[in-house]
Amino acid sequence: AKIAFFKSKNFSARDVAKLYVEEASIYRFTNNINSEKNLLYQALRTLLPLEKNSGLPKKNSLYPENTFLMIFDALAEIETNAERKIDYYDLSFYVSDLIKDNLVSQESLIIQQFEDRKRTEQCLKIFWLNYQKTKNNFWIDKAFLYAERSKNVILKEQSNLKTLAELHPNNKDLQLQKQLISEQETLINQLIRLQITGENPNEIENINSKLATITIELKIYNEKIQKQFKTEIEKELSISDLYAKIKIDKTQLVYFFWGNQSVYQFQISDNKMVWNQINLEAKFTENLKKFIHFFDDASLINNNIQLFTKTSFELFEALQFSILEKSKNTIIIPDGLLNFVAFDALVTQKTTSKKYSEIPFLVHQNKLAYQTNATFYIKNTPKEKQNTIVGFFPIFENTNAELLYSKEEAKALLPFKALLFMNEKATKANFLKNSSQYSILHLSTHGTSGSFSEPATLVFYDDLMLLNELYALQNCHPQLVVLSACETGIGKLQKGEGAMSIARAFQYAGAENILFSLWKINDYASAQLMTNFYEDYAKSNSFFEANYNSKIAYLENSDIANAKKSPYYWSAFVYYGAVDSAENNYLYYLFFGGIAIIILFLIYGRTSRLFKSKKI
């Protein structure tokens, strides 16, 4: 076959390199490592004919080519030297980044990211072994940075573009890129709708043609923006900045990386990082899934409270939460199946109590907030609240989908002079018209988590809203989105990117903080919790504190029956956002105010010297 291939004369360097890689894989099966390695380097020289160095190629000689990934990954797998193994993986990461620069759809980026996650896990294995041997914190820091680099690449890219647009509001390339991304998501939404309904098949071809044109245009603008803002875009997370943020927030952070064989956990507090490994053994995964499935139906916990508390405590122990500092704000950055865990409902001690208000839930020990990645945690600082609220309450009266207690929930917004769209006025058009004009968006409606073939949806009075329509939102940067709807935090789980949920779609669009549910919550409990939330927010002016206190108030409410105090009812809502308590707000204003004064002082000094020099 090889002789016939070369006789054909109709081949490229890429074809030859791939042939060498395939031949090398045959030697893998016969355990002939030297022959495999020689063929892989032969493939490398074929792709880099001008590279004279016989060792590792220089990064600036590489280009976006999938065959490089096959070569470097294979070399890493057969390499026995740990340091050189990492060097090969780093070259794969570099080429993967070059490839991602040319990708313009979320779907293609997710596929590319999937392979990066596998490489990251291999690197973490090496760092873990080195840490076990040396106990040198250098390996913890390195592992954390690699884990963070693999998290939410698409969301981070969107966040970077938003920041660039704020810093360079008149840049035409950024404006056109933003418009093209919005048009792309709008077309994808139209395509998905047509595929679901089976209507107008001819229009599908037309949309695909438009998408192909946009793809070409986006590649051009992406390249322009990469060249213009390369130094501003490529900034790696600083661990010292992370420690500084944790100190200001007076918090501790629990960070997870979910791999194929292990879950790696980083507990960070007071300039100290502890690294743990949790093996994905059957006992751990079964217990985790059992805990998650307790929230599938309201009756499951109530029917067997003791089994639930036992399962919950075992998970608490398995996640090594027992070493958390008590009575301290805690940020959780979940991953994998942990995205679907209501950590508030973990039980911190063995108990036989069947009275929910007496069960030692984690919510009584620590105030929790969540984030998707450490970069977002650092960037998400408390801002002065605008407190302009718009609410959407379709209610769906006299239908099987009626939300009976949604009216009570709406009353909680009245003291804020909120604009409320009730019943038939809670339309998709009114949402699109108003979503960019208010600092808090409140949606009390139905939501779906989607399926393998269909995306998650948000239900308005007159129509469904699919994920891609939310991705396409422009100038939608609310300080808070409240999703008082079923399953708004659930969606198809993608490695590294998390659940493709309604909540993530709002993050993608630009929401700063989000409060959403993890399962089909009872609308009475939802109304009660939201009432508690806004009553507390009116006093505390803190999303973080209001979310915590709404749950405590619910558990302490003597008018609510014990069965309704099951964590199924009160722990569904999770808050992804800043720790914006009053004390922290003061510290941030003091910190940034101090920086502003220093800048003004420097400008004044420079101006004074300039005037003096002119007088002379």
Residue ranges: model-predicted function:
Residues S150, V254, Q265, T330-I332, ...:
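Residue-level detector of buried hydrophobic side-chain packing
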Residues L307-L324:
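Phosphate-interacting basic helix/loop segments used at nucleotide- and nucleic-acid interfaces
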Residues I333-G336, F392-F396, N423-E424, L443-G447, ...:
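Active-site-proximal beta-strand/loop segments in catalytic clefts of secreted hydrolases
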Residues E454-T457, D462-C476, Y524-I616:
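Caspase-like cysteine protease fold
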Residues K162, Q226, E234-S238, D270-N276, ...:
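Catalytic-core domains of enzymes
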Residues T372, S439-Q528, N532, L600-F601:
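Catalytic cores of nucleophile-dependent amide-cleaving enzymes
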Residues K2-N302, N329-A342, R504-Q507, A527, ...:
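Alpha-helical solenoid repeat scaffolds used for protein-protein interaction
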Residues Q158, Y264-F266, W275-N276, F340-F343, ...:
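Short helix/loop capping segments that flank catalytic or ligand/cofactor-binding pockets
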